[in-house]
Regions:
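Small-residue-enriched hydrophobic alpha-helices in membranes
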Residues: 1-143
């Protein structure tokens, strides 16, 4: 699990964070097992109330618009949501054009550096390679 600060955000910001991730699951009209696993992991980190979790699950079936998700998104929650949206989008091994466009829209809304998404994608690739090296190491430890 990522060392994180999502759980330190106010409850309302954690909810908006989770809604944006729910939106991202449907950007390309395809929800892979890897994306869902990442979504569930991040949702757990958000520490939402049972009622809020129920609302987020409804958003998975009928996602809000990106504009709705961005409307109440604070700076810190936005940066964390963008980071986790990048992780989710890349979790299936590729980031398609629709996903990349949505990520860029989020970064633009947050007024981040022009190369923010590119840098987050590079960081994600490095992180996934590091994780794979860990799995490879575990396999090499067997006799």
């Amino acid at each position: 699990m990522l060392p994180d600060t999502v759980h330190k955000l106010p409850q309302s910001e954690r909810f908006v964070y989770a809604r944006l991730l729910a939106y991202m699951t449907r950007v390309d009209n395809e929800l892979t097992v890897e994306e869902m696993a990442m979504f569930e992991q991040r949702l757990g980190t958000a520490l939402l109330s049972p009622k809020q979790r129920q609302m987020i699950r409804a958003d998975l079936k009928n996602p809000p618009s990106l504009e709705e998700c961005l409307a109440d998104l604070g700076d810190e929650a936005g940066r964390l949501a963008l980071r986790d949206a990048v992780l989710m989008a890349a979790s299936d091994g590729s980031v398609d054009e629709d996903e990349k466009e949505a990520l860029e829209d989020i970064a633009d809304h947050l007024d981040l550096a022009p190369d923010a998404v590119k840098r987050l994608l590079a960081w994600t690739v490095e992180g996934y390679a590091w994780m794979q090296a860990g799995y490879d190491l575990l396999n090499d430890l067997s006799r």
